[in-house]
Structures are given as structure tokens and as C-alpha cells.
Amino acid sequence: MDPRTSLRHLFLVLQLVMLPAGTQGKKVVLGKAGELAELPCKASQNKSLFFSWKNSYQTKILGRHGYFWHKGASNLHSRVESKINLWDQGSFPLVIKDLEVPDSGTYICEVEDKKIEVELQVFRLTASSDTRLLLGQSLTLTLEGPSGSNPSVQWKGPGNKRKNEAKSLSLPQVGLQDSGTWTCTVSQAQQTLVFNKHILVLAFQEVSSTVYAKEGEQMNFSFPLTFGDENLSGELSWLQAKGNSSPESWITFKLNNGKVTVGKARKDLKLRMSKALPLHLTLPQALPQYAGSGNLTLNLTKGKLYQEVNLVVMRVTKSPNSLTCEVLGPTSPRLILSLKKENQSMRVSDQQKLVTVLGPEAGMWQCLLSDKGKVLLESKVKILPPVLAHAWPKLLAVVLGGITSLLLLAGFCIFSAKCWHRRRRAERTSQIKRLLSEKKTCHCSHRLQKTCSLT
């Protein structure tokens, strides 16, 4: 063996021998700030013995002498105790409540003329700000521990996302994916400590920002939130695709204790809003002039949230010589607008927003707005045959004329019947008066019946 190697090995052995005896077999206990830790002290005999707990400065913390146990004058006086029920089993643990990071250090249990050392390491997980934060804000989580400690740290976020193994975790511009429970696992000397921190990102949930509608149909706007216990005020402002150059307010509202109350709203729109979460708006009719972009603003105590929403309206118009389909409002260039007759090939728009067919054939036509084969909007219109289309006005006039003639004839018949009854009644009245004036009446039964029959 090389003499230099032998000397190196001998030097290492001497270093190990010279280490303080108290450090050998030292028990390590990990604790969380604010909770309690139990430091073990086990005697070889399963019976109650005298014992004493001290810190590394030999200050007495807690012990038993004779039949009494008492606490020392340490800074832990109000936060320490022991489990008396375990003393008969030869166990004399030191329980420290409401742990603080400065409580970290070496504690010594003296029992049976021997010293048992326990190293306590207290850690705390702190956040740079409130863990309820707005979308886009930043947050840093920091693991605090005793100076000189170098534990293994592992961070894990929602969806088991793993992060760096440093003592701090930075989350710049938090998003919806960061909302949830974050776990910090601390490992030291085969001991493990787990911290959980729940982060709530106040934001709108992910929903489609564009609503598609056919002209005249009812439209619903929904704005689900990631929270429901914040009081706020809100406003939906709208910029029409063809109209004013500046946005105008459509509706204002407030949310207090989960109840929604409407402030001001445009009367001509006849907007309806749900009285509870999620935020829900109903537009009775989607008209072409309403197509455009809107912005919903929520005012919270922590700041503002914004959500953009677009309304795309499809309109189909027909004339004697053409059929036109168009969409109004903001659309993506990748969308395809097509017009086709059933069971025939499509006629695709070159402008993405308008397609026209001249001299459309009779039958059912479809106008489609699609995105990579997925139909977003569909409108159908029926084109009548040319002969029927030209004859339809005349046929309608004939039908209306016939109905009018029947009504006039019925009125004439009713009037004639009333006149005949009136004339008949007048003749009978005149005949009775004439008979009475000539005194041709009598009291015999057959004459009386005749007179009565005349009346």
C-alpha cells in the first residue's frame, strides 16, 4: 500500500475518534412553526425514574426530582410539558408547543446517568403576499429554518408539477394553472416534513370568448369565476362592429354576499342578468347592429379583472335574383363561410364574411360558418320555384279577393234578413191596430184565439 494513502486513512480515523461523543447517535426531530414537537427520551428500564431536560447552554427546562416535577427558568417555560402517563414505561418526552424557528437547537435529556441528545429543527413556510391574488400578480413562497441547516426541499404544484429544489419558490404572473394546493416537502436525517399552501387565483374561468348567433335568436353570455365569496362591482361596455368609435356601457351591476343587483342598463337591449353566480347575461335578440366586441370589468378590493367577449351574428337575405349570407362581428381569418344547396358542393366565400349566389335554384339552402370542419353557425333558407315565386303575389291577391267577397256576401245576407223581419213585424202591428179600430173583436174562444195568433 502507498505510504501516503496509509497516512491519509489514519488521519481520517483520528478525526472520527476526536469527534464529541454527544454527537454520535443524535436524534433529529423536525417541527413546523406554530405546531408542537415531541422530543423523545427513553430509559433502558420500563419504570418511572428521575430525569432532566436541558438546552445546549445547560439551562434546565423541565425535570423530575423526588415525587415532584417542575419547570426551569428557560424561555420555554410556558410552552413545555411532558407526558406523565408514559413515565411508568420509562419514556420521558419533552413536548414543546407553539413552535418557533428560534426554538431550533440541541436538547439534552439526562436519565440513568446518561445523556441523550436530540436536535430540533423548526421550519416555517411563508408567502410574500396574500395567497388569494389576482390573475397576473406575483407570489414567492419561502422556507425558513435554522441557520446552517441544509435540508432537501422539493416543491410540487397542482397537477403534480415539480419545481426547483431551492428554499424559495417564485411564481411570477400567476395564472389559472397555479391555482390550487402547493406542497413543500422537507427532508433531513431520514425525517420528513410536509407543508401545504393553498393558492387561489382570482380570475375568470377559461371559456370561449366568442359567442355565435343567428339573426333574431336569443343569446346567452356566461362569465364563470374561480371564486364566489368576494364583493365586487362590474360593468359590461360594448363596441359595435359598425357604429360608434368608442365603447358604450350596456349594463352595470354589483355582487354582494353572492347576490347580483343591476344598476344601470340600456333599455332598448332588454338585457336580463342572473341574480346569483355564475354571472349570466341574456340578450333576447341578436341583431346585426349588436355584433362587435365587449369588455366585462370587475372591480375587487385587490384590483380589477377584465374579460373580453365577442358577438358574431349571421344574417341571410334573399331577393328574386340572389341569395346572400354574411357574418358581422370580429372573426378569425381561419374561419370559412360557405353557402350551398343541400346535397351539392359548397360555394366558399373569398372574403370570409360574405358569400352571394346569383339566380339560386329552388330548394333548401344552407349557410355555414366553420372552423377546421367544426360548424359554429348554421342557417337554412328555402328558395321557391320561379313559377311559384312569380305567381305567388297573384295567387295571394285572388285568395284575399275571394275572402273579401265572401265577407261582403255574408254581410248583405244578414242585413237583408234583418230588414225582412222588421217589415214583417210592422205589417202585423198594422193589422192588429186595424182590427181593434173596427171593433171586430169578440169574447168567444175561437175569435180570441184568432186575435191572439195575430199578436
From Swiss-Prot:
Residues annotated as signal peptide: 1-25
PROSITE patterns assigned to the protein according to its UniProt record, in alphabetical order: IG_LIKE (PS50835)
Phosphoserine modifications at: 430, 437, 453
One Pfam entry name: C2-set
Extracellular side: 26-394
Oligomeric and partner information: Forms disulfide-linked homodimers at the cell surface. Interacts with LCK. Interacts with PTK2/FAK1. Binds to P4HB/PDI. Interacts with IL16; this interaction induces a CD4-dependent signaling in lymphocytes. Interacts (via Ig-like V-type domain) with MHCII alpha chain (via alpha-2 domain) and beta chain (via beta-2 domain); this interaction increases the affinity of TCR for peptide-MHCII. CD4 oligomerization via Ig-like C2-type 2 and 3 domains appears to be required for stable binding to MHCII and adhesion between T cells and APCs.
Xref: InterPro entries: CD4, CD4-extracel, Ig-like_dom, Ig-like_dom_sf, Ig-like_fold, Ig_C2-set, Ig_sub, Ig_V-set
Membrane spanning stretches: 395-415
Domain comment quoted from the record: The Ig-like V-type domain mediates the interaction with MHCII.
Entry annotated with the keyword Glycoprotein: yes
Disulfide bonds: 41-109, 325-367
GO biological process: adaptive immune response; cell adhesion
Localisation: Cell membrane
GO molecular function: coreceptor activity; MHC class II protein complex binding
The Ig-like V-type domain, residue ranges: 26-125
Residues annotated as glycosylated: 46, 220, 231, 295, 299, 343
Record-given protein name: T-cell surface glycoprotein CD4
Residues exposed to the Cytoplasmic side: 416-455
Region of interest called Disordered, as start-end residue ranges on this chain: 145-165
Membrane topology designation: Single-pass type I membrane protein
